[in-house]
A protein has these predicted regions:
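Core segments of cupin and vicinal oxygen chelate
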Residues: 7-49
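Short beta->alpha transition motifs characteristic of CBS
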Residues: 104-105, 111, 122-129
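Vicinal oxygen chelate
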Residues: 9-14, 70-115
């Protein structure tokens, strides 16, 4: 499906500190990068990778309207912890952790904007048993 996700930043050191803190509760670890202006994270044994770095075209990084990166979490607690880590690291709140049944039953998520304004989403889809279910397609409400 996906190979990788790339997020631009204006300050790599600041972004690395932010994403190190935010990815840890999700079980996503920073991995070695052979590129000086880029850092990379990955959940062990899984794809895709997250790359954060300075844009190749040397233009300032900026967020895209309607663009969002969503990271799966193993539990509601992991969503809560990732959200708290993001806010503590300077993220802007875009939606506190909570159920979002309009997306799907058991859909629990939180939204933040990172230090460069990129929208980030943490999500856990739990069945009625409370166990996390594998990622699946969302059924979005009709946009009228």
């Amino acid at each position: 499906m996906s190979s990788h996700l790339t997020i631009g930043t204006r300050d790599l050191a600041r972004a690395v500190a932010f994403y190190d803190a935010v990815m840890a509760p999700l079980g996503i670890e920073r991995i070695p990068s052979k590129y000086q202006a880029w850092a990379s994270w990955q959940r062990p044994g899984e794809a895709p990778k997250l790359w954060v770095g300075l844009p190749f075209n040397k233009e300032p990084a900026h967020q895209g309207n309607g663009w969002m990166a969503a990271f799966s979490a193993s539990s509601r607690k992991a969503v809560d912890e990732a959200y708290a880590a993001a806010i503590s690291a300077g993220a802007q709140d875009e939606g506190a952790p909570g159920l979002r049944p309009h997306f799907a039953p058991g859909y629990y998520g939180a939204y933040v904007r990172d230090l460069d304004g990129n929208k980030i989403h943490f999500v856990c889809r739990e069945e009625a048993t409370g166990a996390a279910s594998p990622p699946h397609a969302l059924s979005l409400p009709n946009a009228e």
